[in-house]
C-alpha cells in the first residue's frame, strides 16, 4: 500500500478521523481470533472451575463483549459505532492452547474489524489476569482478523 493511500492522515500528515459522512450504511461483520497458551494444569483448572477468581471463561466472555462496545474509547481514530452483535467463543486443544474467537456485527458506515480484534485481545488479557497467580508464563499470540464482510472493500478472508 502506498503511503498516499492511508486514510488516517490529513494534508499536513497529521492524524485525523476518517470522514464517513457520505458512506452508505451497510451490514458489516468481522471475526477475529487469538490464542493463549498455558500450562496443562491451568487449562484443566479453568475447565474444572477451580480458579480462585471465579469462572474464567464467563468473565472473559463478558470482558470481550464489553471491549467490543468500548473500542472507540481505546483506539483513537476508531469511530463510535452501534454494535448490533458481539459474541465470544472458546475452543481448546485439550492440553495447553485456548483459542478465543469473536464475531462483531453492525449496520453502519464503517467496519467492525477493530472491535472484533479488541474483543479477543481483552478476553485473552482477562484470562491471563484471572490465572496469573498459578501461571505467569502464559503467552498470548496469533491475534488476527479471520474474516470481514461488508463495506466498500468487500470481503476479506485470512489465508488458512
UniProtKB/Swiss-Prot annotation:
Class of enzymatic activity (EC top level): lyase
InterPro entries: MoaC, MoaC_bact/euk, MoaC_sf, MoCo_biosynth_MoaA/MoaC, Mopterin_CF_biosynth-C_dom
Active site: 129
Gene3D superfamilies: Molybdopterin cofactor biosynthesis C (MoaC) domain
Keywords from the named record: Lyase, Molybdenum cofactor biosynthesis
Lyase as UniProt keyword: yes
Residues spanning the membrane: none
Reactions catalysed, as given in the entry: (8S)-3',8-cyclo-7,8-dihydroguanosine 5'-triphosphate = cyclic pyranopterin phosphate + diphosphate
GO biological process: Mo-molybdopterin cofactor biosynthetic process
Pfam families in the record: MoaC
Pathway: Cofactor biosynthesis; molybdopterin biosynthesis
Protein purpose: Catalyzes the conversion of (8S)-3',8-cyclo-7,8-dihydroguanosine 5'-triphosphate to cyclic pyranopterin monophosphate (cPMP).
NCBIfam families the record matches: moaC (TIGR00581), PRK09364.1 (NF006870)
Quaternary context: Homohexamer; trimer of dimers.
PANTHER family linked: MOLYBDOPTERIN COFACTOR SYNTHESIS PROTEIN A
Listed name of the protein: Cyclic pyranopterin monophosphate synthase
